[in-house]
């Protein structure tokens, strides 16, 4: 918690020109009344569900149990639905956020918040930037940062202020200096800061509790809206390093670090979650949680673009969550954590074996990535040409740089999908490549 609370009551200041103009779709706004008892709808242009050729969907899980979606549940999945998501799934995800981030009930007076389901968190981010950022605005990010976000931001001709990081993420002193010495005659003062606090992509850094408090305090002081993009939140390893290998172990309390949302006293955090890393990336289910006023604008934008996330994907997730309950969900998260911890350790072993003394890196405590600093001035040609010739795929640091005109010594390696043997062979090939480069 910060010493002083600067509670936000009016979010107009944070909206882009387009965001301020966003209005509800007249037809979509009627959806909320369609389920009222006795309501006869002649308003919506919904296709008649009796014409759909699907009778039921059956999915077998890896533990042998089954999900069956049929009847009214299947009809709901295949029909147009409210933009924020299927109501029962939206409630289940709100319950998850309350449980995991210690949130108040969503309708508590003065603290009203909401949750909107989207086609993956990438869509949520794009929607948020649409209603928050104007062309030629300033925005603060970590440097390096997620390439997918840069792909959204760079075409807007923004002043992207990349703040240096250390092993715990964005350095507060660097952020404080940037804001306190801002030249208002050159650039618009930023309203938004974008952060990836856990298992940062690409650097693998994770903010500890004090770092989050320090960053939050500065954002409160300078009235910045925080975009907390946290797809690797459930891939934190510290709670798994001493866990038993029993995949049936009870995990009633996941030992995960406090999120920025959980410490938000001002109402300045928009949190973005994803099920891609923990259930399935192909389901394309993400969700954004935050102040009701801001989410209303995001909802209006989504009404005019994709309408809503896939009803079928939502129905599958809802059926799974209902079958699992809290305990089984926690067990699955614990399994995911142990799985990626083992993959990380496999890569660390191969680095110690083949790359010792050749690269610099920090051991990640969350996520899927290791960020190497190489003994070369620019990794781009080395990776795009030489590494490809040796049949190893890595990503050069320039792909994640807020300033792509400057060379980068860094490379991102992912340990998520390759086997132990493939990881070892790839790291060996990479070491051979570096040794050859250093001999030139």
From Swiss-Prot:
Keywords: Aminotransferase, Cytoplasm, Pyridoxal phosphate, Transferase
GO cellular component, one term: cytoplasm
Cofactor(s) needed by this chain: pyridoxal 5'-phosphate
Modified residues (N6-(pyridoxal phosphate)lysine): 277
Domain of life: Eukaryota
Family: Belongs to the class-I pyridoxal-phosphate-dependent aminotransferase family.
Record's protein name: Aromatic amino acid aminotransferase DDB_G0287711
């Amino acid at each position: 918690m910060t010493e002083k609370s600067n509670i936000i009551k009016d979010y107009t200041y944070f909206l882009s020109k387009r965001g301020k103009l966003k209005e509800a779709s007249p037809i979509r706004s009627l959806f909320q009344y369609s389920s009222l008892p006795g309501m006869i709808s002649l308003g919506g242009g919904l296709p008649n569900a009796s014409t759909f050729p699907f009778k039921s969907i059956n999915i077998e899980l890896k533990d042998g149990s089954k999900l069956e979606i049929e009847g009214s549940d299947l009809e709901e999945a295949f029909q147009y639905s409210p933009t924020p998501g299927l109501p029962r799934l939206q409630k289940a995800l709100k319950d998850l956020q309350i449980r995991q981030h210690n949130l108040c009930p969503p309708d508590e007076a003065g603290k009203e918040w909401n949750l909107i389901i989207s086609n993956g968190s990438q869509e949520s981010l794009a929607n948020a930037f649409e209603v928050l950022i104007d062309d030629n605005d300033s925005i603060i990010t970590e440097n390096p940062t997620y390439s997918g976000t840069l792909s959204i931001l760079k075409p807007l001709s923004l002043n992207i202020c990349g703040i240096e990081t250390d092993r715990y993420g964005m350095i507060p002193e660097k952020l404080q200096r940037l804001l306190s010495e801002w030249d208002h005659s050159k650039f618009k003062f930023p309203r938004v800061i974008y952060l990836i606090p856990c298992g940062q992509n690409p650097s693998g850094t994770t903010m500890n509790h004090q770092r989050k408090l320090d960053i939050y305090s500065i954002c409160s002081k300078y009235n910045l809206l925080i975009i907390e993009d946290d797809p690797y939140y459930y891939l934190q390893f510290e709670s798994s390093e001493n866990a038993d290998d029993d995949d049936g172990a009870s995990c009633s309390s996941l030992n995960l670090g406090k999120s920025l949302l959980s410490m938000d006293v001002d109402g300045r955090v928009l949190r973005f979650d994803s099920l891609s890393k923990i259930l399935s990336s192909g389901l394309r289910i993400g969700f954004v949680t935050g102040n009701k006023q801001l989410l209303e604008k995001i909802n209006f934008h989504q009404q005019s673009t994709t309408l809503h996330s896939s009803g079928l994907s939502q129905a599958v997730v809802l059926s799974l969550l209902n079958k699992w309950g809290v305990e089984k969900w926690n067990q699955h998260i614990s399994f995911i954590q142990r799985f990626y911890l083992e993959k990380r350790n496999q890569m660390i072993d191969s680095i110690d074996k083949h790359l010792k003394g050749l690269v610099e890196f920090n051991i990640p405590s969350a996520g899927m990535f290791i960020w190497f600093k190489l003994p070369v001035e620019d990794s781009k040609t080395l990776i795009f040409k030489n590494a490809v010739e040796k049949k190893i795929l890595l990503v050069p640091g320039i792909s994640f740089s807020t300033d792509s005109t400057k060379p980068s010594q860094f490379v991102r390696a992912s340990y998520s999908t390759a086997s132990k043997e493939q990881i070892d062979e790839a790291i060996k090939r990479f070491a051979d490549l570096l040794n050859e480069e250093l001999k030139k």
